[in-house]
Amino acid sequence: MNRIILIGNGFDLAHNLPTKYEDFINWYWGNIARRFYFNLSNVYTDCLCSLKIKRSTWGEFAYNNYSILHPRPYHEYIKDIMNDKENFEVQLTPFLQNICQSIATKGWVDIENEYYYLLNQCTFSPLPFEYKDLNEQLSFIQTQLVEYLSSICIFRRIPVQHFR
């Protein structure tokens, strides 16, 4: 089993770049919310999760719940949706559950560790998913992470006065 060890020097965080996994997961939830918002569908599915609005479309939901128009982290919207079982049906894979749980409880996540933990679980005990599913999910996350990191704007103008 191959493992990758990443050693960071903190340069990105020292310059307030949103490069933590928590930032990435918030971006992921934001993509889902934006897809719903501009879509007439009431279902979203990928290999990590499935979200369904039971009674209306996302546009109707956003219109009737003005709080969604007030900016706040997307993971807060998703948390509200997960808690509203009357109007929403949410299914997360164990991998995404572990990632979100780690962020919620510790304020950070090590995605590679979560993957490795579940991979060991697949090997040593019967689970409702196979290692192939887990590998597909990790590959999806990697693809999404590349897209996310490519979208981060690192060039910004800093006024000269800032350096005086």
Q: Where in this protein do the model-derived segments appear?
A:
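Short secondary-structure boundary/capping segments
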Residues: 18-28
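Short, hydrophobic/glycine-enriched beta-strand segments
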Residues: 2-12
